[in-house]
């Protein structure tokens, strides 16, 4: 068992015995003796129960499995979370997909320990349904409902004695799982369910049990979520699991006081996984997400890729797509890494598969909207003229530095001259890859998995040839840029010379969607005209723009290729500079910026215009002329590139968005990069140390995210506490070993963890996906073993 990264090392406790206070009914070779270790009783009881009843318990990555639809239960399954995957050496993705059948309530109980403490509640979608004999059972589902956990006989609540594991599971859940919502326990009688048990207590634990008529359920209050109590409960579960829970039950319809029911004592075994828990003030971050972004808090990003690979997938392409046979495995061995204890719903890095790549192609590269309604060819020269009048100073232009180009050709030698003499080289062919880290959502209410992104790029020697040319053109562009226009290149620029203050100013921001794939022939030709006027050598300029008119994108690893026209290539030499020029071209035309005073900030597709009066423009030109979907952001805010532009001591300073930092606090990090991660954090938050900024930022956060200033201030204070020392920063990380990728190793871990008991463990694995075969994760047996 791995220790944590901070001073308090975790020492696994020695396994203890579990004693059974139950009175077994009928003849049973395992009649309870309080002096005998209960593990053996558990095994024997489970063997007897399942031998006679022939019941299976299914742990599955599917919420539904037809083989297990028996009796009154419509569903038997467990939707796994990442915390089950943190089981040392055990991970369903290591099997390549599929399900695990077990027939031991002890295995069932240990799996339950591994899943539920990793969540603040079961409301995140966890389903745990256990069916026992006699039509009774225990159910944990997405609504925090326990069904048929008790038998009600002769006016008394009685634990099921036929299955010790079931009683233990019920006791563990009731005592140690925090209750963010009302929990109901349905009591099944021989006739029909007649009542419910509502459990609630202000601090999130259960102190009393009473019967409530089903019609009165609406009157039962919902308990609040107390994060500090959640942390305490989880810590007790994993470090000091030794409960004795007394339920004082009273019957509202019989008037009799039911006898107290004592749950068995249970001591944890070393196989119970150590889940990283927020400590101290880190719990305030969880509280912030629970209160203001519950969807982020409850989201389980670790299952996103699994869901993509297991679900059906349909996509239409308006262009021809070439698919080739390739072996692929979306689960790959990862290095040792540190896991954050803060639940922010941050997406896991994507692994390139055919499904992910096809989804990225369909969303990012093909199917561009066709909204242009005006002739385009006649506008090229006029748009270029307006661009120069609006953003660049007049005079001082020449045709380029001939000495620079001569030196460039001389240094590049034979490679460059071979290109010059081989104009028909296939430079229209691009390589393509999937971007592993996508843009995550900052919407507090509706976090969704971001659309996957592709990166298209040339081979290294092509970039080596064209990069110096574009650097020279950019240098000429910046040397003639107007003083009231800022284009950040490298670190964020000093805005004080442009904007002394935002007070009393009107801010205009345009959100441009589908930016890369919507760029068509008009913007392509206007860029070419601008580059030529900036001194780009004509032969090289014509060549560059020629192989951007129609390109062939190829992913050699996944065997996917297709063609695109005109749109921006996201990884070529001029991506950032070209996107910035496109934004400036459109803004100058739509708002006629050459005829009014303004200050402007442009960076890629991000933009911010500052004027004395509200800006009026022909917004319809975005779709009708430029084929671009655009949304005017009102009211505008001094926010740009995920940074607030704050006025401090008469200077405009870019300050990173604390909420984005909080969101990224849920990221995991490889151990070898942890120190670099901390240094990057210090550099990114250096502007937050100023008192003026820390006073201003909570007000800006409250306006943007609709939270109170106190809540924003607490979040900001927590970020600043991480700057105090590296130890303080590392406290919300925990070490986790890499998942084993060997089936034999996994089998060994199963047997060592669960003991040498007569458990039937069957593992299925789906066929490797390709464009000719369908995944069948439930019917293809890969390995079967019995110990």
UniProtKB/Swiss-Prot annotation:
Molecular function GO labels: nucleotide binding; RNA binding; RNA-directed RNA polymerase activity
| Pfam families listed in its UniProt record | RdRP_2
Does the record bear Magnesium in its keywords?
no
Query: Known catalysed reaction(s)?
Result: RNA(n) + a ribonucleoside 5'-triphosphate = RNA(n+1) + diphosphate
Q: Which UniProt keywords apply?
A: Nucleotide-binding, Nucleotidyltransferase, RNA-directed RNA polymerase, Transferase, Viral RNA replication
UniProt cross-references to SUPFAM superfamilies, sorted A to Z: DNA/RNA polymerases (SSF56672)
Coiled coil stretches, renumbered: none
Enzyme Commission numbers on file: 2.7.7.48
Q: Which GO terms describe its biological process?
A: DNA-templated transcription; viral RNA genome replication
Please list the residue ranges annotated as the RdRp catalytic domain: 505-619
PROSITE patterns for this protein: RDRP_SSRNA_POS (PS50507)
The organism's superkingdom is given as Viruses
Q: Which family does it belong to?
A: Belongs to the ssRNA positive-strand viruses RNA-directed RNA polymerase family.
Subunit description: Interacts with replication protein 1a.
Q: What does this protein do?
A: RNA-dependent RNA polymerase which replicates the viral genome composed of 3 RNA segments, RNA1, RNA2 and RNA3.
Protein's name in the database: RNA-directed RNA polymerase 2a
